[in-house]
Amino acid sequence: MVKSKLLKLTSAILIIILLIFSVFAIVGCKKKDKYRAENPVLLISIDGMRPDAIQNTDYGKYLETVCSYTLNARTVYPSITLPCHMSMFHSVEPSEHGVTENSYTPSPEMGNGIAEALAEQNKRTAIFFNWSPIDNLVKPNKNVYSKFIDPTPIGWEEANNQTAAACIDYLKNNEVDFTFLYLGFLDEAGHADGWLSEEYYYALNQSLALVKQVVSQLSKDYTIIITTDHGGSGYGHGSDSTEHMTIPIFVMGENYAKGKRFDSASILDIAPTILNIIGVEIPTYWKGTPLFVKD
């Protein structure tokens, strides 16, 4: 009887020991296999943000002190949201990628964009947006995470809030090489109430407050690019006027000098800048060049 109890006790102890070792082995494997983004980049596009407008905000003035930047970069013509973002991601003019209005009609010859170039090197991309055509900027693949917040039932201001929150939550738990955050509230305010109106500045400050929240959650190894697709005047955009074609670009990171201005810059330079930071070869057919300023 005693021997039987001892055997049962010994067996129970052995099972417990085996379970403990199994747990440690599983945890160890998870740690070993955890993906690591070596040089992560966050690109933020605040749709319709004029450089003279952000210059009039407290956060805009702060960015000028901690970033390499320009308030005089050029976007592409036509200065419309989807064509401009397609050029931002593919570093070619709309005449080459084929998207010349806010509908997705790409050229059959259109090459890789940021996400596709990264995916070929098994690098990860995540995009967060609240204007549905933005989904066309990347081709679906296993290395891309996409999150759309629909503004229709909740309004644009709340859609901005939820889009930024989704970005923060995802990056807390996932390693990503390239993250794109698109905020559409400002452009909608411009169309509804006019560029540089009181409502426009309200939307701008709300958007910048969200940018500040997102940036505050990131580790120091991130490089952060804050920009836009186009400007605007009156109640619209799309022309080749200075108010529509001039955009700001801010770059914050260890390899970018604080308070220094880029000599010249274009929306076409954003994609090659991102690949250069991450360490992936830039496609030869891209038209832009990496933005780089150091002390």
Regions of interest found by a model, annotated:
Residues 13-23:
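Bacterial N-terminal signal peptides
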